[in-house]
């Protein structure tokens, strides 16, 4: 179920994002649909991941999100020239996204080599799906984290606000810190479930 929700959300979001040649436009109904399905899916996935492992497993998944976010920001500032979605988030660039892919994959490849902790998600992924498949899955999760960030920016622009709340001054609000994890958590849960059912 999580995988179906994630896939449907991802397809609809990017279809809307790139279909419009004269600027981004999305309906309130589509935003509401994505919010009421994806936020609960992310929460349930978080609980399921805790049941499968412990805080190390969950933290390792969130490190993918945070690593992609930080890497995309600094790589975008250093080399960004081509904007990804200027109507939604003018500062996001394709160069930043590529930098995020490379840094996250290299970091977790090194983690796999030097860290023997089995509860780390990427170690579990590489051990059970193979290194090449693991790299492909990591690239997909980075793409989903960027999509989640863009989705939250889209919602804010739709309602005409800059920050989602005042809870974390200077960071755009609590939701701004968690937006990228919303699609990643269901995707991670789906991947682990697939490995358990198909690979094992």
Predicted regions and their residues:
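Membrane-embedded alpha-helical bundles of polytopic integral membrane proteins
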Residues: 1-140
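Secondary-structure boundary/capping residues
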Residues: 55, 84, 164, 199-200
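Acidic (Asp/Glu-rich) catalytic motifs at the cytosolic membrane interface
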Residues: 65-81, 85-86, 94-95, 143-185
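Short, charged low-complexity intrinsically disordered segments located at boundaries
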Residues: 105-106, 184-187
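Juxtamembrane boundary at the C-terminal end of a transmembrane helix
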Residues: 113, 190-200
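Short, conserved aromatic-histidine micro-motifs
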Residues: 120-128, 171-173, 178, 197-198
């Amino acid at each position: 179920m999580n995988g179906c929700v994630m896939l449907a959300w991802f397809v609809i979001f990017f279809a809307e994002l790139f279909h419009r040649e004269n600027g981004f436009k999305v309906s309130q109904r589509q935003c509401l649909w994505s919010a009421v399905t994806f936020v609960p899916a992310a929460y349930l996935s978080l609980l399921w991941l805790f049941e499968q492992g412990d805080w190390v497993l969950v933290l390792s998944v969130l490190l993918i999100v945070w690593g992609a976010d930080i890497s995309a920001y600094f790589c975008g500032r250093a080399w960004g020239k081509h904007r990804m979605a200027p109507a939604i988030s003018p500062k996001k660039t394709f160069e930043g996204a590529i930098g995020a892919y490379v840094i996250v994959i290299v970091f977790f490849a090194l983690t796999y080599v030097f860290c023997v902790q089995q509860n780390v998600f990427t170690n579990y992924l590489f051990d059970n799906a193979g290194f090449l498949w693991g790299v492909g899955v990591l690239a997909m999760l980075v793409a989903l984290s960027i999509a989640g960030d863009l989705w939250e920016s889209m919602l804010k622009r739709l309602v005409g606000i800059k920050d989602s709340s005042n809870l974390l001054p200077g960071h755009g609000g609590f939701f701004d810190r968690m937006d990228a994890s919303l699609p990643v958590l269901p995707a991670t849960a789906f991947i682990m479930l697939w490995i358990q059912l198909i690979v094992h």
